[in-house]
Amino acid sequence: MPKIKTNRGAAKRFKATASGRYKRAHAFHNHILTKKDSKRKRKLRADALVAEADTPMIRRMMPYS
């Protein structure tokens, strides 16, 4: 049986953790940053975890992660 292809867009956006969850970056932190205050930009810098409801979908897109 052939290998399942990894969704390349998902592979660039998500990283698996040791516990089986997935890390992701926050949105709204790439451009138009001058109007956002420092506190908001600092909080957007940190990684977030993908919601449990979305994890099965990510797992299907990245079968070997």
UniProtKB/Swiss-Prot annotation:
The keyword Acyltransferase does not apply. Keywords: Ribonucleoprotein, Ribosomal protein. One of its GO terms (molecular function) is structural constituent of ribosome. It comes from the Bacteria. Pfam families: Ribosomal_L35p. One of its GO terms (biological process) is translation. GO terms for cellular component: cytosolic large ribosomal subunit. PROSITE patterns: RIBOSOMAL_L35. InterPro entries: Ribosomal_bL35, Ribosomal_bL35-like, Ribosomal_bL35_CS, Ribosomal_bL35_sf. Belongs to the bacterial ribosomal protein bL35 family. This is Large ribosomal subunit protein bL35. The lineage of its organism: Bacteria, Pseudomonadati, Pseudomonadota, Gammaproteobacteria, Chromatiales.
